[in-house]
Each structure stands twice: as C-alpha cells, then as structure tokens.
Amino acid sequence: MASVAISEIVTQSANLRAELKEWERAFAAQNGGRKAERKDIKKVPEIAAKYKEYSRLKALESSSPNPDDPKSVQLEERPKKRKRAFKDGPDAIQNSSTPRKTAKGALETPSKNRLSSSHPSQVDPYISPTALRRLFSPSTHRTPLKTAIGPTPQRDGKALGLFDLLSESGGSTATPSADRVASVRAANVRTPSKRKTMDTIMEEDEDGEEESPRLGRTPASSGKKWMLSALFATPTTLRYSAMVEDGNHITERNLGPPTDPEGTARDVAGPETPSFLRRSNSARYATSHSANPSLSPIAVRKPPQFVGKGLSALVQGLRDMEEERLEDDLDVLREIEAEQAALNVEVADSQAPAEIIGRHWKKKGQKRTTRRVRMKPVISKPASKPQSASDDENRHQAAGEEPAEPAAVPETQQPRALDAVFSEKQNEEFDDEDDQVSLHTISEPDLDSDPEYGEDIKPVTKSKSFSEKMKEAIGVAQPQPTEDPAKPSKPVIEAEETKKVRARKVNPEAHANYRSLKIRNKNSKGRGAGRFRRR
C-alpha cells in the first residue's frame, strides 16, 4: 500500500507541475515574456492553491523512505523527445576501437542529489564537486582519461598540431560526422594499410598509391594554390611544401653552381634573433630547406614553451594604463575649462560708469625747475597835460627864437636803469663759472659785450636786494616840469639824441612770470654760499 500511495503522490505532483508550467507559459506570453512572480501568483487564488498543493506533495515525496524514480512516470502532456538512432545500431561504435574498460560516470553530467542530508552551512566551499573529483583522481583513472584523450597525432616522428592536418591547397580533410563514422566502419573490416583514415588529403604526387573510398574532390586552381600557400599557409604547411619541392627538384640542385660553404653555414645557423622575439618564422623555414639537398629526418618538436611577459613589459603596460587614465582625466579637465571659459565671457555693462569724484590722480614727476615770480602791476600817475604846439610857437616867436624840437617823453621804465640792474646781476652770476647750472637759458636776456652798454654805469659798492633793484628799475616816472626849458639844456638833449638808445633784446618764447633758476652746489665757496643764493 505504501508503494501505491507513493506512486499516486508522484503522479499527482507531476500533473500539478505540468498544469503550473502551462499557466506560467501562458502568463509569459500575455506579459511579453515576463515570468510570473509571487505577487502575480497571489492574485490568482486557484493557481496559488495549486502551488501550495504541489509543495505539499513534494514534501511528502521527499519524506518517503523508498521513493520511486520519477523518470519512470510517463506524462501525456509532455512526451519525451525522440533521440536520433544510429545507422547500424548502438553496438556498431564498439567495433571502431579496441574495447576498453569503461569508467562509470566519467563524463556524465552529475544529477541533482535530492537526498542531501548535509545543511548548506556544513558544506566546505573548498571541496570540489564529486564529478570533477572523480574525473581527475588517480585512484579512478590509473591511466589518465583513457576514454577522453586519444593518442597524439604524429607524422615523421613529430607531434602534429591543430593546423598541421591542413593540406597545401587549403582543402579540409574533415567530413560530416556520419560519413566519417561510416568510412571508419568500412575500413575496420579490412587489413590496415599504411595510410590512416584520418590522415591529410592526398597530394597530386601521391594519387597512385591508394584511392579514397569517396569520390575525389575538385582540384584547386593554380592561382588559388599560390594564394593559399603564400598568404594563408601556416609555417608547418610551408615546410611540407618546401620538402615536396626539394624532392621534385633534386636534379636541378645537383646540376646548379656550387654554393659558398660559409654562406651555407650562416643559413643553417639561422639569424641571431631568438625565436621567441622573432615576429615571423616563415622566412626561417624558407632559408633552412634550401641548404638541405635531400630529405632528412626532422628533429622531434619540443612541447611549446609559453614565455610569460617580462618585468619590463609589465611595467610598460602599467605605464600605458596610467597614461591612458591621465589622458582621460585631462580630457575631462579640458572640457570643464572650456565650459567655464564660455561662461566667463565679458558682457558689456548696462549701467553707465560712475563719474570720477575728486581730483584725478596723476603720476608725480619732476617738480618745477623754474622760479615763479608774481609781478604786480604798477599804477602810474596820470601825466601832466601837454602844452599845445601853437602856444609854444607863439611863445618862441614872441621871444624871437626858433621853435625847438619836441623833447623826448620819458618812458615809464627807463632803459638805462634796467640795463644797470641786469648788468650788475650778470656780473654777479658769472663770478663762479664752475658752479653754474642753468636749466632754462632761453628766458635769459642776451647781453652783448658792447663797450657803450655800460660806460655810464658806475659799480655799486653795496649789493642791493632783488626787490630793491626791481623797484628802482620799475620806478614811477616823475612829472615833467611845467616851466620852459632853458637854453643851455639844448646841447644836453642833442647829446642824448646823438646816442642811439640800444633796443633791448627780449626772447619772444620766454614767459613773463618765470625766470630761470640758478641752482648751485650747497657747499660751493662762491658768493652767496647757498643752494639758491640770496632770495
């Protein structure tokens, strides 16, 4: 009864699972491929009840002591996928190789162990899975992987690689798997020959040895052969093609001119660059086969040594990575600076600039080098009323005298007095010529050494101040006497007229309110003994 109850539980759980799967597919089709979640299941109470029933049945099934294999239950809704049958039955494969002892479960996918009594917290994470532990353990396989790894393909005493099975013309020896298995089965019933079934395709020189059971392939054109051999051929293929050419042209090499033994030795030795640093080894094969006049056994190729990166290569790689990172950072900084420069464009101010309040600043330079003199205007008294000419004539006629020439009207500024002042000043200035420093000589009056200029001027014993001299020079003219001039005064007037009054030279560019400063040394011993002399 227990077995019948367990089988019913398994059948019910399988049917419920099929129904739930159908509902999940329909839900995914309605919602664009989205799988049903817990909240979607709760929205449909019928499906939620089925899920609860299914989980209850699975719990009963797992708690049963001897559960039946669920794979034995046949489902009507989901029939099993039909596997492809072999052509000659499954036992025909055993004839293709020597029967060996099969390892149980060597390459099988491990099935989920539902009766795992160990809790996940008790499982060691560093323990490898059971299948991998069985696959690589020496106790299971005394000879490693007999059924997985076959014999290494060799040719002429050397191991062949993946690309060594290709022919010179570029054709492929691989055939569809079913045809290849059929040809292998056909070959097993015969006495084995030298040529193996999985060898390379026969070249044109070997056509007479043995014919393939299959139809021959279309021969490649000469252009295709050259392109494949020159551009797309691997180094091993180039070496084999060179060996074939050597066999075909042995007589031509024997009849050719003798070669240099030193050059031959150099070619055999090969270039000085190590093989792991050479970019391509195809040229090496082309030069090496020309030195051998006949076919010679090729040394067994050693297993390839994988040369790792050196320290310098690792350091250079790290530097390149750092430079790329720095370049990225610099690009980001340049973009930020460009954005800031675009934001900081100067815009014309809409407000008018405020007027400058106060005195405008001016850089201080050299101060005034000339002394400013303020000349006050002189108020002249009104001159006496001149007598008319008719009265003078009548007076002279009454006296019985000829009318005299009109007397010269005196000027407000007497030239004689001015000349005396300036000559005295000039004499004082030229006493000490070494200490004289003149900045503005244009404003000085030009004085000539005329003997008539200072004849009547007597040297002044006592020096007068500048203000006194100016007062004397700019003096108020005395009014003329009203009485008639005496007769003895005529020759004096005539003598004065005979002397021409020399005109005073005045520089038109000189300013009236400025005079040149005579700056002298402080410690000079000349008259004045000061920086600016007397003031």
UniProtKB/Swiss-Prot annotation:
Bias-annotated ranges (Basic and acidic residues): 68-79, 455-472
Keywords noted in UniProt: Cell cycle, Cytoplasm, DNA replication, Nucleus
GO MF terms held by the record: DNA replication origin binding; single-stranded DNA binding
Encoding gene per record: sld2
Pfam families: Drc1-Sld2
Ranges for region Disordered: 58-156, 170-221, 249-302, 358-535
Protein location: Cytoplasm; Nucleus
GO biological process, one term: mitotic DNA replication preinitiation complex assembly
Composition-biased stretches (Polar residues): 110-121, 278-295
Descriptive protein name: DNA replication regulator sld2
Naturally occurring in which organism (per UniProt): Aspergillus fumigatus (strain ATCC MYA-4609 / CBS 101355 / FGSC A1100 / Af293) (Neosartorya fumigata)
InterPro entries documented for this protein: DNA_rep_checkpnt_protein, Sld2
Tree of life domain: Eukaryota
Function: Has a role in the initiation of DNA replication. Required at S-phase checkpoint.
Keyword Chloroplast in annotation: no
